[in-house]
Amino acid sequence: MMFAGTKAAFNTFAGPQEFGRWYSARRDRSRACEAWIEQHDQILGYCDCCEAVVPLGVASGATFDHHPSLREGLICPQGLSGRARLVFRVVKWIGVVADGRLLDLILYEDLTPLRKAISRLPGVRAHCSLYHAEETSSGTAIVVNGNWTTHQDITASSYPDAAADIVMHCDVLEHIANYRAALAENLRILKPGGLLLFTAPFFVQQPQTQTLASQNSAGEITHLIPYPEYHADPVRGQILAYYRFGWSLLDDLRGAGFSGARALVEFDVFSGLTSNNNPYMDTGNMPPLMVVAMK
């Protein structure tokens, strides 16, 4: 029911052809809006977390050449970026339509503004964690920056089977060398009919996922591009990206046992939900996108 409702409430796509037809009618208008936004330090927009029209800070520090990343920018007063506010909007909507049921949500994230916002949602019981180190056992209590949290390995968590109505992670999967093992683990801990929701670098121009680096059984890493790609990480400072995902990621989800894997795209300029603002439309631009799949 939640999955069917999510498809009805948001624009979702099973493959590049239907997305391409939909996006071609919106691409130029979206880019014009983003060009206007990047000329300002802040804009006014509606935030689902703040439940009000609020100032959204345009720049976060992340840039493409001199263009600010609007995926990591457009930050609301509670600290949620455009990417995080998209996630919050979808989870909030699912909580509203859950008919009063308390939803168990496993979130592979902690100590962030998004985690705090999700934990305040009525009808959602959040179980949050961080990845600490390979030698740490999943389920172990750890201290990060003076705060207690729990270590969980997304490929081998300590959660029991069918523990969650929703499993969620945000820009985690690209950092997992064996990401298919993570998808299998996500499936294991979901209840039947439960939803997997996640963000990741998903490039709608790519039919296939691009592998940037690989890791052998001994843990040795081979870089497959001239300049390895690292992303900021709150625990380790920076972390290697192994993949730039394409539409084949949806096939991986179906192969793992999920049904109805789709890309959810939510353009809403008034709410600060835009593309990442990368000027290279054929290689680096990403729409405001999440992946959704059902067990």
Predicted regions: what they are:
Residues 58-59, 97-102, 171, 186, ...:
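Short, charged, low-hydrophobicity "junction" segments
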Residues 7-25, 31-45, 180-294:
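S-adenosyl-L-methionine-dependent methyltransferase catalytic module, highlighting the catalytic core
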Residues 90-95, 152-155, 183-184, 276-279:
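A generic local structural motif
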Residues 67-73, 141-153, 241-243, 281-289:
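Glycine-rich, flexible loop segments associated with nucleotide phosphate handling
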Residues 85, 177, 244:
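Conserved phosphate-coordination/catalytic loops
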Residues 3-4:
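Extended, low-complexity, charged intrinsically disordered regions
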Residues 100-217, 247-253, 289-294:
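Conserved SAM-binding loop
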